[in-house]
Structures are given as C-alpha cells and as structure tokens.
C-alpha cells in the first residue's frame, strides 16, 4: 500500500489541482503519468449542475467517439429470425432469444453491450435486476432497442459510448487509450463533452457543466478548461 501511495504522490507532482488546463496540456500531463505496464484507458469525469433524483434532470445518451475507444467490446443481441441473422452478419458476438435470457439468468454475462429488437423487450425485461445495475439494459433513448440491429452493432463496435448521470450529478466515461495520439484524444474528449452538453435536460438550473477532468486508469485527475474543447 505504501508503494502505491508513493506512486500516486509522485504522479501528482507538477499538477496544479486548482488550475483549469487547456485540453492539449491536460492530455500531455496524463500521458506523461500513464506509467502502468498496460495501455491505460483515458477516462473523463464531468460534474453537472443537475439532481438526478428529479426525472426532469436526468442526463442520458450515447456518443459515437470519432476515433473509437481502443477497446474491443463484446456485443450481445436479443433477436429472432432475420434480425438475429442481421446481428450475426454485423459482427455481434452473442445472438439469442429465450436461450440467451436463460444464460444471463444463470449468471453468465459475457458481453459489454446489449441490444434488443422492440419485440424482445417483454422477454428482456425479466433481466432488469441483472442487467440494470450493470448499465447493460437495452434502452431506446440510447439506440439499443431498435429494429436496425446491424447499425446498432456496428456503432457499438466502432466507438459508441453510453453515458448516464450518477447520483452525485457526475458523468464518467472512457474516451480512448493513453497510446492514442493527442489529436485523437482531443477529438474524442470534445465529442463526449459536446454530446453531454446537447443532452442538457429542461429541468437543469444554473451552470450545467461545472467541471471537466480527465485521467488515465492509474493516474491522477487533471482539470480541463471547457473553453478549449471544440467538437
């Protein structure tokens, strides 16, 4: 534990925890500190001026990152017949109906994204207590309940990232890898922030985007000046 504490303290050196850094400077700082033996994920955290306890202040959506996430997602699709065939052809990793429901109910969740055709939702609804807490429940608002399963699968494989505000008014997401070049990371971060901005609920009062910070998996957070972000 002491070793971890020293590493974190060292990584924080040279970072002003109050300053809002231009996006390029922030990216440089986190990449310099991404010293793990694996390709660290670059993550974003946004503090929003909303209270998700109120239905009219819920923030949820999906963003297609222009440069992908750097991660290969396993996609499951609940569909039958021709739609199941379309999903398979589009690259879905797991396709099924009652059999897939039984697999999930049995405790096996071997996927990172879940898509369903509308007619499958009464069946998929039985999995709410399992998929919901994991953020895997299909939802038409983010394009995962759809008849166009091929497009949904390709979007998921190509860099679509869902976001949803948490209890404290925070949204978090992955925007790439530390190995990405600066331009690609900057474009992904700007796209994520822009999508959250466009998802502003009618019930939001005052300053909507209050804070933006980025970090690598094992590194400290760096606050970003939102004015330097352009999608």
Swiss-Prot record:
Family assignment? Belongs to the universal ribosomal protein uL1 family.
| Keyword presence, Amino-acid biosynthesis | no
Checking Pfam families in the record gives:
Ribosomal_L1
What's the superkingdom here?
A: Bacteria
- Tell me the organism: Methylocella silvestris (strain DSM 15510 / CIP 108128 / LMG 27833 / NCIMB 13906 / BL2)
State the protein's name. Large ribosomal subunit protein uL1
One GO cellular component term of this record is: cytosolic large ribosomal subunit
- State what this protein does: Binds directly to 23S rRNA. The L1 stalk is quite mobile in the ribosome, and is involved in E site tRNA release.
Which Gene Ontology molecular function entries are recorded, alphabetically?
A: rRNA binding; structural constituent of ribosome; tRNA binding
Per the record, the GO terms for biological process are: regulation of translation; translation
User: InterPro entries from the entry?
Assistant: Ribosom_uL1_bac-type (IPR005878), Ribosomal_uL1 (IPR002143), Ribosomal_uL1-like (IPR023674), Ribosomal_uL1/biogenesis (IPR028364), Ribosomal_uL1_3-a/b-sand (IPR016095), Ribosomal_uL1_CS (IPR023673)
User: Which CDD domains does the annotation name?
Assistant: Ribosomal_L1
